[in-house]
Structures are given as C-alpha cells and as structure tokens.
C-alpha cells in the first residue's frame, strides 16, 4: 500500500471551506460535520476516513512564539579560551507587542508575559538586540531569522535571554535545522539564499518568519490502496475531501491545451498517451521557497527549478513528467523496448542491465530513460540547462510494474503508473508544468513536440436499484444512487427500456480517472462509500446449540432472501474444503489464550531451509496410520518420504507418480515429490524460494528475539506453505468414482498442475516455561510442553490427536513423533535437531510442532459444536499394564479405548517404569468413566476395564498388575 504525503495548505487551495456551504450534490448533508474556514489536520483525516481513506499526521508545526526577520547591523568576532570563535551581533528586529499595543520591554521575561508572540506586528517599532552567534556564514546587512525570547523550536527547545560567552544573548539567530526546514546546521539561514529578486526586496525587518517560510504548515499521510490510483495526488485527495464535506472542488489543471507542433517522435511501441513540449531560454537558478517547502512536506528533495516543477506537478495532478536536456538528445526520440544487453546509467548513479521487455525512451545514441520509472544521467537536467524537452506519457500499468520490480526500482513515478494514471490528464498536466516553468523559470514555450493518445471511453454499466440492494444489503432510492455516482464523476442516465415498476435501471459511464469501476459491485461500493456506511444495518449472527457440526448453510433463506428481508449473494464453494477463516481465527485465539504469542513471518526462505524443514506429510494427505501396529510403526503405505535432490533415498524427484495401494486396495497415484518453488523476482536474492514449512520462519523469529534479550519464547504462526504442483486427483482417498469406504470421503481436484498451498499451524518453544519465583521453582520448556501445544491445537479444532514415535530430518532422533488424527498422518512434533537450532544461534532445547490444518478440516473439524455439560458423576480408576519395552504407549491407549467402549471418557498415561532385569515396562493409566444418561455402577466400570485388559493382552501380551 502506497502512502501519499499531503501538505494541508496545498490541499485546501483546491477546496472551498466556508462555513455553511452546501455542495451541489446535497449528499450526506445531515451526517457531515461542518468545518471552519481553516480545517486542521485532524479534521481532514476524519473527513477522508469517512470516504474510505486512512491516514495519520506526519508533520505537525512545532514552532511558535516571536520568530521574525532581522537584519544584521554589525558584529564583533571574539576568540575565547576554548578556541571557539563567536560573533557578538547587533540585529534589528521588530519588538513583540502586548495586548495594549505597547512594545514589550527587553528587560521583561517573555515567559511571564501575555504578549502576542505568535505573530510579529510589522507596525511595531524596530529595535536593536544583542545576540551571540557561533556561525560565520553571514555578513553585515544580511536578512536572517531571529527567534526572540519566548519562542519554541522543534524538539521542545525554549528560547530565553541568557548569558553566553560573557554576553547576554537576547534571542538566537536560527539555522535551517533549528527551524526544521533542512539538515544544514553548520551555518545560519540567510534569506538571500532562499529568496531572490522581487521576493527578497519585499521582505522587511520584523516580518513574521513563520508565514514567510511556510513553517506553520502541517502534512498528513494518506494510505492509497492499489485500486485507487486516482487518489495518488493532491488533486485526487482534494476531490475526495470535497466529496466528504459537500463543498466545491477547484481543479488546478488548465482547461486549455497546447497546440500540436512539428517535432517527430518514433512510437514503435504505442503507449496510451505520449506528449512532448520544447521549452527554451530557461533560467534554471533557484526554486521559490513556497514550492521547496511544499515538496519538502510531500517528502521530495528540491533539486533545481525545472526538476522541482515536474515533481510538483506530479504530486499535484498524479501525472509523472520527465524533463530531458534537449541539447543532450541526438536525433529524434523513440519509444521502444530495450535491445538485448542494452544498459542505462540512471540519474541516481546506478547502471541497469535492461531486459528486452523493458519499455524505454531512446535517441540515436541509446537509451535516455526507463519509461515510467527513472531517467538516465546522460540527459539529466542541471542548473546549466537552457533548453528542455518535457515529456508527459501514459504507459501500461503492468509493463511499468514489471520493469520496476525487475530492477528493484520503486520511484514516485512507477508507484503512480502501476496504479493506473488517467490517460486524459497527460496533456493538461504538461500545460500546467509549462505554465509554471514560464512563470518561475522564464521559459519560452516553443511548440508541442508530439501529441499521441489512444483512449477509448469505458462502456456504460447497466445498474439497477436491486443490484445495489443485493450487493450492499440495504435499499436506496434511484435519486440517491444517481446523485452519489454523479458526485464521483460518473455520467448517469435512466434506462427506461430495461426499467420496470419495481426496478429502476440506470446507465453509468465511469470517468476516465476511475479505471477501477468495471462492474456492478464496484459501483455499489462507491454508492455506499458516498452515502455512508452507517446506512448499512447491523446483523447479529448466533451459533445455535447443537451436538453436530454446523453445515455450510448458516442463514435461513426464504425465496432467496434472509429472514430480515436482505438478500444474500451466492458464493461459489471451493473445490476442496480447506480450513476456513473462522476456524483459523478461533484457533489463533485459542492458542493465544493458552499463552502463545502469534507471529507473522515472510513466506520466503533459502533453499536449505525449504528442504530441511519440509513436513513431508503435507503433500501426502492420503497417508493413513494403523493404530494396532504395536511397536513404533514404520511410515504406512501411501506415504512417500521426501529426499532433497542429490541425497540418497528410495524416493525423490525421480520417483514421481509411483502407484501403491491404500488399505482398501484402491489405487493411489501420489503427488510428485515436491521441490522448493523458486521466485523469478525475489525481494531478497538469498531467500528466493517459497516456504514448505513454517518452522524456518519461527526459527528466524526466535533468533531475532533472543538477540534482543527475549529468551523465553512460545510463539506460533498460522499460514500457508507451498508444496509444488499436484498431479494427484484426490487430497484424501482414492481415485474411485464412488466414495472410498476406507477413506470415508472423496475430494476431487478439478484441474491439473495446481500448487498445493495448505494452511498449517506451527508452534515453537524455547527457554523457561515457568520463571523462578519465591516458593516456585523455575522450569524449562521440555518435550511434554510441545505435546501439550499439539493437544491445544486439537482442542481448538474440536478433534483428537495421538502421537507415534517417528523420525524426521528437522527433529532430534528419538525425540520426534508424528501426529495422527482419525488414522491419518497430519503433522510432526518434537525437539528440533540441535545442530539446526545452533545454526540459528539458538540453544539445544528448542521444541516445535507443525500440523496441516487443511487435512484436519477435510477429516472433519467440529469447532462449532456446543456440548452439553455432563449431569452424571464420573468414576476414576487406575490401570497398570506390564508389556514389552518396544510397544508404544499411544498404541496401548488406542487399544484400551477400543476395549473399554463408550463408557471410557478419558485416559492418560501417568507413570512409566522400566524393569532393569528384563525387557519389560509397566505403564500406569488414569481412566475416567462416565455414562451420559445415568449413574454408573461398579459392575459396569469393572466390566469395561476387564474388556480393555483382555484386548490389550491379546494384542500385546499385556498383563495387568493388581
């Protein structure tokens, strides 16, 4: 999102702010706040926000008090013992006046007086003041800026009369930096350096320097979204401000355009518009202070009058201009694409190796500028330039955006062209620049060199009152709709041929500067933006109490309308059911409530990070797990292990499309073993790949926090990962036309070669889980904490996870488990490999988990289930089983659950004891039984427990200890 810096005084030149004025449109007259003759920055931001533009105050005036023009009458140089040379000056200024119009005595303390310090009275008597100054860049008779006692400077500096170097200094002669108008602090500000000729001769001693140097102006920063390029100018923002307050807008552009001339331009690549103008006999000496100050507030540095004028017109109108030194051009200009291996030395000192798709402006000797982006040094305008060729073009936004990103050049011009500039404004902006050059640089306008424009008016859009009602959700009259659209510049007429008694139809033709208005939805957005968002009624949505997951339909519809009469626009469902925004939001809130901190990382990584942390299950969503396998299971049929190119392993890029069998004996064609997706134009050349896991970003985030002393971290991220192109027809299940009984559902991908971009959630923990306090022992994060984090994710999604020991190249061997949900492998959890953690300057004990949310959603989340609280009591018993060391506890829990049946509400492992003299171990579980309908009896609990023991004995040879 681009930011436009808007000086307040500049904006108010183009709008009328008289109190009580009512605009021609009459829109929102009851809701608009009336401003005074001089609205402050807060008023402007409030008005712009009401029409959809956010902003903030950037430059607020920090100068106040008696800051006036003084003349240096005489000075005496003194060298002090510390080696510093100072000047003891006599400066003639105007004395500040008190309310009774009597001069304020120099002997009085200004801080205790009530005199008018904000503006000097030019009719007051002149007086001479003694001032100590450390600068030496001025002479007798120079006009300077004097800050008298009682004035305030930027940074909270309060000027008082005080003794300096043995003299009482009755004020201060200010520098550029002290006044906030520049960075020069070596010498004081001489007005002869700022003003020349008639402007300088009109300045009198005692004049208010704040008004003279425009130091009371403030600026606001307005955020411009990519679709609102028409607002990327003072003219555009002024139009929106006038719209927000029902006041007239004064267009600064001249209506008269320049006549066509005879200069020849070779347009091999046709732009949307291209105009040039030859101007001679330029006096390129000094830019007037009012323009320098406005450009400074707009964030642009002053260069020379011609360049400043082109920048000024660009900020004012939104049309970028470029000035060429006409004497540096050889032959005629040509607009073409760059040749192979052609280069351009830019005005900022860089050398660009141009691409054959780059649009350039060239002459007989080569490229002069990268069109719409930046100019070249060979034809740059300097203070010695006498003849210029002024260019105003309009180019394809996509071409300019690609060139800008290709060369990593983001200029004021490219920011505007990439957002689309009004084609019809080019010639008027050129005339405006010519007018300023003639007035400020004595330029002689010779002729309009070339005039080319290719503009086709947008086709009218058919709009009805029912269209607005359907999109917005509330009704407006035809008069309101027509009035609001005319207010933004649209041509609106009634279409009686398509109108009916119930539906009023209009033909709407957007203005040339609103290329973003292309359909009914765009027009509806403008209508509600102009009329007011407060006209949209509030609707309360509630989650009904139910035991089953909510279906996709959440509203009761009757004849295509909601119960309250508002229509609901049809939404095309996605091809596959990924995790929804609401599910992700609730999961994030759940994790944050548990003490985790959410972070957002860039999706760009280097190749090493993309490979080592790839969670391979995410591209194998058909992977299943058999809970009855006993010992630590091998990856089941249907899962392809990923290996990086060049590494050894059974699978890899050469094993794409291997067919295996799922448990239902249905054929599955795997997704290809994915490699990292590279970016053609990365922001950082060292991170030119899309992430395949969230863990690399969390490791970098942890490193940044640890380097700043934040050592105890529990962070998480919810975001997409990018796993290459899919060739499989299913996300879960098989290729059968009917629903696979083993997989329980069918989800077909309709198109081939799609990039699989599942949402995943990842948690990373390191440091202290509990800080040491009085009566409380501290504790570091350990493996149990990250398993608890995975369980928190499960609770947030309304599902159950269990864990099976496994291996993964990013995790510590023996301290890694894969996460299973409904017999499907959906992620990993464990301790990060210490060597990987150390590469990020992290301690050895770093724990993480990563879960594929899209897979969980397809398996069936139940976030919105509201369960009834139990009314019957629970019965708790312990169970200790002795079995082999190689049997995983998760497998035992799964079997015990199956054997105990529905009465078993919860089971968890509370103790493990390994026998030293045998290969046996004892596992102790806490079991909670409950019947939802009635009170349990001891006989039923014992029977359920015996059934569980019997099944565990048959599966694993387990023996219950009594």
Curated annotation (Swiss-Prot):
Catalytic activity: tRNA(Phe) + L-phenylalanine + ATP = L-phenylalanyl-tRNA(Phe) + AMP + diphosphate + H(+)
GO cellular component terms given for this protein: phenylalanine-tRNA ligase complex
Record's keyword annotation contains Plastid: no
Cofactor(s) listed: Mg(2+)
Binding residues annotated for Mg(2+), in chain numbering: 516, 522, 525-526
Subunit description: Tetramer of two alpha and two beta subunits.
Designated name of the protein: Phenylalanine--tRNA ligase beta subunit
């Amino acid at each position: 999102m681009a930011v436009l810096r808007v000086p307040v005084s500049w904006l108010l030149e183009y709008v009328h702010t008289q109190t009580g004025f009512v605009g021609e449109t009459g829109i929102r007259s009851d809701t608009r706040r009336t401003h005074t003759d001089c609205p402050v920055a807060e008023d402007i931001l409030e008005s712009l926000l009401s029409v959809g533009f956010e902003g903030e105050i950037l430059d607020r005036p920090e100068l106040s008090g008696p800051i006036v023009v003084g003349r240096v009458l005489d000075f005496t140089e003194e060298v002090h013992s510390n080696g510093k040379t100072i000047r003891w000056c006599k400066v003639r200024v105007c004395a500040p006046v008190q309310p009774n119009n009597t001069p304020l005595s120099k002997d009085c303390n200004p801080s205790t007086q009530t005199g008018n310090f904000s503006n000097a009275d030019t009719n007051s008597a002149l007086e001479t003041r003694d001032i100590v100054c450390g600068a030496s860049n001025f002479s007798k008779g120079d006009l300077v800026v004097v800050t008298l006692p009682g004035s305030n400077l930027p940074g909270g500096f309060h000027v008082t009369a005080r003794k300096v170097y043995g003299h009482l200094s009755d004020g201060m002669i200010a520098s550029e930096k002290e006044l906030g108008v520049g960075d020069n602090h070596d010498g004081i500000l001489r007005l002869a350096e700022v003003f020349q000729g008639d402007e300088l001769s009109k300045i009198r001693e005692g004049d208010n320097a704040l008004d003279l140097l425009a130091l009371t102006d403030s600026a606001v920063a307005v955020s411009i979204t990519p679709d609102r390029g028409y607002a990327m100018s003072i003219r555009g923002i002024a139009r929106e401000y006038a719209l927000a307050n029902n006041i007239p807008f004064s267009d600064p552009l001249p209506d008269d355009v320049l006549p066509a001339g005879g200069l020849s331009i070779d347009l091999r690549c046709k732009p949307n518009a291209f105009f040039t103008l030859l101007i001679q006999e330029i006096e390129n000496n000094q830019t007037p202070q009012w323009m320098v100050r406005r450009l400074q507030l707009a964030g642009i540095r002053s260069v020379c009058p011609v360049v400043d004028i082109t920048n000024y017109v660009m900020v004012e109108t939104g049309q970028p201009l470029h000035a060429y030194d006409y004497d540096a051009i050889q032959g005629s200009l040509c607009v073409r694409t760059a040749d192979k291996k052609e280069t351009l030395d830019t005005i900022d000192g860089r050398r660009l190796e141009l691409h054959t798709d780059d649009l350039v402006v060239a002459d007989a000797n080569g490229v002069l500028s990268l069109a719409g982006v930046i100019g070249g040094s060979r034809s740059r305008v300097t203070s010695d330039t006498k003849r210029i060729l002024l260019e105003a073009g309009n180019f394809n936004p996509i071409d300019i955006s690609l060139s800008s990103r290709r060369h990593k050049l983001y200029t004021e011009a490219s920011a505007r062209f990439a957002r689309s500039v009004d084609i019809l404004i080019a010639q008027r902006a050129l005339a405006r620049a010519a007018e300023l050059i003639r007035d400020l640089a004595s330029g002689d306008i010779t002729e309009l060199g070339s005039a080319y424009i290719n503009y086709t008016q947008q086709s009218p859009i058919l709009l009805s009152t029912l269209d607005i009602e359907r999109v917005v959700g509330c009704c407006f009259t035809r008069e309101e709709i027509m009035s609001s659209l005319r207010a933004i510049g649209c041509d609106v007429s009634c279409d009686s041929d398509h109108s009916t008694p119930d539906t009023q139809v209009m033909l709407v033709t957007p203005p040339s500067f609103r290329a973003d208005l292309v359909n009914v939805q765009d027009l509806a957005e403008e209508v509600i933006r102009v009329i007011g968002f407060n006209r949209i009624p509030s609707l309360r949505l509630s989650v009904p109490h139910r035991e089953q997951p909510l279906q996709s339909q959440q509203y009761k519809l009757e004849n295509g309308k909601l119960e309250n009469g508002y229509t609901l626009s049809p939404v095309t469902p996605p091809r596959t059911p990924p995790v929804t925004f609401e599910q992700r939001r609730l999961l994030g809130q759940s994790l944050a409530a548990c003490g985790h901190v959410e972070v957002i990382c860039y999706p760009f990584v280097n190749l090493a990070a993309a490979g080592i942390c790839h969670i391979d299950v995410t591209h194998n969503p058909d992977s299943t797990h058999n809970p009855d396998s006993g010992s630590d299971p091998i990856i089941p049929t249907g899962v392809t292990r990923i290996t990086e190119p060049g590494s050894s392993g059974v699978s890899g890029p050469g094993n794409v499309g291997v067919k295996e069998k799922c448990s239902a004996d249905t054929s599955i064609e795997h997704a290809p073993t994915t490699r990292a997706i590279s970016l053609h134009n990365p922001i950082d050349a060292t991170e030119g790949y899309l992430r395949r896991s969230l863990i690399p970003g969390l490791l970098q985030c942890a490193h940044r926090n640890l380097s700043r002393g934040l050592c105890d971290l529990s962070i998480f991220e919810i975001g997409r990962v990018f796993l290459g192109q899919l060739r499989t027809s299913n996300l879960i299940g098989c290729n059968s036309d009917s629903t696979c009984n083993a997989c329980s559902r069918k989800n077909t991908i309709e198109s081939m070669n799609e990039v699989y971009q599942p949402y995943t959630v990842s948690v990373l923990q390191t440091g202290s889980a509990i800080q040491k306090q009085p009566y409380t022992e501290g504790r570091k994060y350990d493996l149990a904490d990250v398993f608890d984090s995975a369980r928190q994710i499960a609770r947030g999604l309304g599902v159950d996870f269990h864990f099976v020991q496994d291996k993964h190249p990013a995790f510590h061997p023996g301290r890694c488990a894969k996460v299973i949900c409904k017999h499907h492998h959906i992620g990993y959890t464990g301790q990060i490999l210490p060597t990987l953690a150390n590469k990020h300057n992290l301690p050895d004990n770093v724990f993480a988990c990563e879960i594929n949310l899209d897979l969980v959603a397809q398996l069936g989340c139940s976030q919105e289930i509201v369960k009834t609280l139990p009314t019957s009591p629970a019965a708790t018993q312990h169970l200790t089983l002795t079995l082999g060391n190689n049997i995983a506890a998760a497998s035992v829990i799964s079997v015990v659950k199956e054997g105990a049946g529905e009465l078993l509400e919860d089971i968890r492992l509370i103790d493990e004891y390994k026998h030293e003299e045998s290969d046996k171990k004892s596992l102790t579980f806490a079991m909670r039984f409950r019947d939802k309908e009635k009170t349990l009896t001891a006989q039923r609990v014992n029977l359920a427990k015996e059934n569980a023991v019997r099944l565990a004995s048959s599966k694993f040879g387990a023996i219950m200890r009594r």
